[in-house]
Amino acid sequence: TIRKQGAVPATIAIIGGVMKVGLSKEEIELLGREGHNVTKVSRRDLPFVVAAGKNGATTVASTMIIAALAGIKVFATGGIGGVHRGAEHTFDISADLQELANTNVTVVCAGAKSILDLGLTTEYLETFGVPLIGYQTKALPAFFCRTSSFDVSIRLDSASEIARAMAVKWQSGLNGGLVVANPIPEQFAMPEESINAAIDQAVAEAEEQGVIGKESTPFLLARVAELTGGDSLKSNIQL
């Protein structure tokens, strides 16, 4: 378990306008019951959801903000947001990337969500000086898949190596986060061909239906789950 490894599990969310680090079972169940009625909260939305006393599900960006306020230097999530496909026309780029460029928190994940443009996402991270570390891998994990056709910026093979890099970065005044990409366990990974076909279809449907902005990711993930007969959701849960 997480505790046996020396860490403390603490789910981050906004409950009744309070930024919370560590939720009770009842609070987690509340968010589950409320479902899509819970506001998706990124940096832009955070003050308004808190001021209105609402419940909020935090993105990577707002989770980083709350973690930093609480003195937490590392957290885990399924996958970071990034540059959406077609962003050269829409400018649809997740606020997660700017938060990673500015906030001193390390995000451990299974790479960027594979519904995104992984190539442009890696380029964006490079431009803003965000290290993209592959944990025991040189290939960038792609959320549902263990590999992709893109590389991480550096491979590190132990937690101690990563911790030393974090310390040196921040002690040197190099503000901003780090991404640690840890591939999904092999037994839960999906074949690239099948998941990419489902993603391509979901992206096309989103364009046809005019789904844009913060609604894009929930729509695409839900549609990919439908197109894969629930297999992608099973993989997502394992992340």
Regions found by a protein language model. Give the residues of each.
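Active-site glycine-rich loop that binds ribose-phosphate moieties when present
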Residues: A57-V60, E88-A101, V105-E126, A159-R164
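Solvent-exposed alpha-helices and their adjacent loops that cap or buttress functional pockets
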Residues: K4, V41, I65-L69, V74-A76, ...
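Glycine-rich beta-alpha junction loops
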Residues: G16-V18, G81, G111, Q136-P141, ...
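Glycine-rich nucleotide/cofactor/substrate-binding loop typically near the N-terminus or early
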Residues: T1-V50, Q171-Q187, E192-I195
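General beta-strand structural signal in soluble alpha/beta enzymes
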Residues: P9-I14, V50, G56, V74-G79, ...
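A C-terminal functional module that forms or caps the active site or interfaces directly
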Residues: G176-Q238
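Glycine-rich, Lys/Arg-enriched anion-binding loops that position phosphate/diphosphate groups
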Residues: D117-S148, R164
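Anionic-ligand binding region
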Residues: C145-Q171
